[in-house]
Amino acid sequence: MNDRNLKKLAPKSLGREKAQLVLKNAQVINVFSEEILVRDVAVEDGVIVGVGQYQGREEVDLSGKYLCPGFIDAHLHLESTLVAPPELIHSALQWGTTTFIIDPHEVVNVAGEEGLDYMLEQTEGLAANVFLMLPSCVPAVPFEENGGVFSAEKMEPYLANPRVLGLGEVMDYVSVIEAEEGMVKKLRLFRERIKDGHAPYLQDKQLAAYALAGIKTDHECIDYAYALEEVRNGMQVLIREGSGARNLEAIVRGIRDNSMDTGNFSFCTDDKHINDIQREGHISYNIKKSIALGIPPLKAIKMATINTARCYNLTKLGAVAPGYQADFVILDSLEEVAVHAVYHKGKKVDREKKIEIKPCPEQLRRTVHLPNLSADDLKLAVPDSPSSLIQMIEGQITTKHVRDVLPAQDGCFVPNAQYNKVVVVERHKGTGHFAVAPVLGFNLRQGAIATSVSHDSHNVVAIGDNDESILLALQELQRVQGGYTMIRGQRVLATLPLPIMGLISDAGYQAVENTLNQMIGYAHEMGVPAHTHPFIALSFIALPVIPEIRITTRGLYDVVDQEFIR
């Protein structure tokens, strides 16, 4: 705080002058002392000037409602919500999230710097704090076929932007622990800044080498045992509760049962669709679920506020105390995290405010370029002996590498409701590259599903129990320039167009929510397991940095052994 601001604010802090806004008779949650104190909160120029007894030019009597810091999402991909960034921010604000630390690697994988510039522009000037982590692995691994490359040299100009905090999730852990030159350049560039991790199943010395590189966080923990190993290595665990990956319960139960200190834990959503946010909440849901599992309410709130602010060096966020930005949430119920009102920089968020969305450059609406495939192209020769296939795990984005004798005719794989066929097709540069593989555990029958949201290269992925439905699904996504589609037989049941880079809708969130809910219902009717989110599960099947086995445009890839399966 500079001298001029101090001279203006100090008289309000001392109570000699009335503050601009005073929220009176609040039960204030103090994240430093872990107390609930009945106090007034005084605000001037968007800054908290005092917590005590104050008078204001404007006063709001909270009549004993709880007042806590605005919630922070430690890691999310705005694109994964499927709606324009301002739509998502507006929706999540209603649930108390006032700070978003985003990794825009989806749009950068599709459109390079143009995608990053789009995200910066779309999130500028909103009634929330939106910070960016620059994508570290574009493409995710060197052999991936995506739409752009984001090198250390291309990152450097963005470091001057005050909203850029650090380096986004480092997925290519092999490049880190082997100190490969391209990765070393990026780590060196961000030497004094925070670096996010992505480290599923790294063990012992590998995890030590990863942490040695200065990587501070990880959101890929799926159980308490692995979370504990990361904490022991000095890392901050970002507990994820998204649409596809729901890891909170397993980790939080471990924290509770072992009386683990919560200081090295934060909350994130990572990839959470707008329909789930509207139904469950945002970071508020992580807090509520943790409290229900036995975490003391104030510790759960700390995991959503000050823990994250400290981790990311956001020194004026995450607490209700003098000098902190006046971002706070008013709660009717602490245990239920029932949001009554939200304030950002001392101004009440208007839930009814019309959302203004800036136009998208036209070239970002033409990103899907698929070959004209035939049923013959999709044939997959298989032996009479066991073949490698992808086994999906219900409720998780990890997979199992299994071998089985596949149903076949004339030496070619014949998909059915048990053994589906998945196809991934390069869509950025019109190369015509594609690959086919068998899948166990998705259980789709009498149709196909396809998506252009396919982490992280975002090629088009289709899965089904017959070639004709798969081909129709691919054709439909070419027609609408990206999105989700559901096919039953030879009929398009429903399509959710995502014309902005094949990732984002230009319709309002309510239209997206309604269509998505309908399509998920169709998928479960057609056999997809109840706890599998069909589109999230499919969107991760081509990401070759999450164990154990994936499919890329070059074929089946063994993530554990780091090699293609021939």
Swiss-Prot record:
A matching Pfam family: Amidohydro_1
GO terms of molecular function: adenine deaminase activity
Record EC number: 3.5.4.2
Catalytic reaction equation(s): adenine + H2O + H(+) = hypoxanthine + NH4(+)
Gene Ontology terms: biological process: adenine catabolic process
UniProt keyword list: Hydrolase, Manganese
Alphabetical list of InterPro entries matching this protein: Adenine_deam (IPR006679), Adenine_deam_C (IPR026912), Amidohydro-rel (IPR006680), Metal-dep_hydrolase_composite (IPR011059), Metal_Hydrolase (IPR032466)
Keyword flag Ubl conjugation: no
Names of the cofactor(s): Mn(2+)
Entry-linked NCBIfam families: ade (TIGR01178)
Family of the protein in this entry: Belongs to the metallo-dependent hydrolases superfamily. Adenine deaminase family.
PANTHER family in the cross-refs: ADENINE DEAMINASE, N-ACETYLGLUCOSAMINE-6-PHOSPHATE DEACETYLASE
Record protein name field: Adenine deaminase
